[in-house]
Amino acid sequence: MNDTACSEVWLCEDREAEVLGQDVMIEKMVAFVTDYRRCGGEGNSHIRHTERAEADLGMKRTEIVVDGLKRYWYTFEPSAYKLGLKEKYPLVIAIHGFSCSAEFFAENSGWHRVAQERGFLVVYPNAYPHTGRKSNALSMAGSIAATPRWNSSIPPEQDGPDEIAFFQRLLERVEADYPIDRERIYVTGHSNGSMMTQALMRFWPEPFAGFAPVGFMEGFRMPSVAPENGVIRNPWYVMGEYDIDTSSLEGDNGNTRTLRMICQCDGLDYDHPRRYECGIYEHTLFRNAEGTTLARYTAVKNWPHTYTPELAFMIYDQWFSHFIRRADGTLIDLA
């Protein structure tokens, strides 16, 4: 399990099965198989125990109404918070992908594991189910049925939920409920959640000290025109070798268009990046005139369209924890 050899085998004798009856046996078999999940990852992926948001992880569900729509999220409280070990706590908002859920992304990404080890709060928001009728030609394709999806196109679909308003209400509520360190609020997401992360980065970057979009680059489907409000954004983009689009930085593609945009936005040197490899990770770093890295891109070898706890640890330790954003909007690299 997670590269550690393990197995669990249940054996039922015919006589026992006869005594218990078919219904009980089916119930036990379902309980056995649903206690495990195979999550995406490098190579053959990873088997993990199922972790239920409330029953297993003790997360707290919060519900609010935004523009007449009932919305919710889960909050994970680390032991450091429960024991009152700090006056203020960093916050990570972790956003699920298309047709997924807050509960599903908690299991896949494992951000609560990082939070427990590093002492910060995690919020897993849930998208509102809708069909996406494509009032915007650059939006995601419509769905046959209402499906959880973030209205994250640029510009957003007119007939979809106002996601910026939702995240503003979410952050207001979380800051009212918990002692949040407002200089250390970060956001990450996968796939459609990566699109949402980039939408927040474009339209409402001021509260966030770090961004980590994984599994989708906005230049793949949408025009990457640099924002002009002067706010520095510091994203760490990640794409897998077998992701939705290519992970290559050769030629004109969604990756290069997105990276050129952020370099223009932040005043970074696109043509002379720093590159290095570490195992399956191929890193490209973009720096400003002072030599500070404010954007990075990572291509992951032998990776599908996924997000893993290992990546969550990397993002926090090697990126989020390095940055704070002052109340006046100034972004500071602590490293």
Question: Where are each of the predicted segments found?
Answer:
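Active-site-adjacent alpha-helix of alpha/beta-hydrolase-fold enzymes
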Residues: 239-294
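Histidine-bearing beta->alpha loop at or near hydrolase active sites
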Residues: 279-280, 301-306
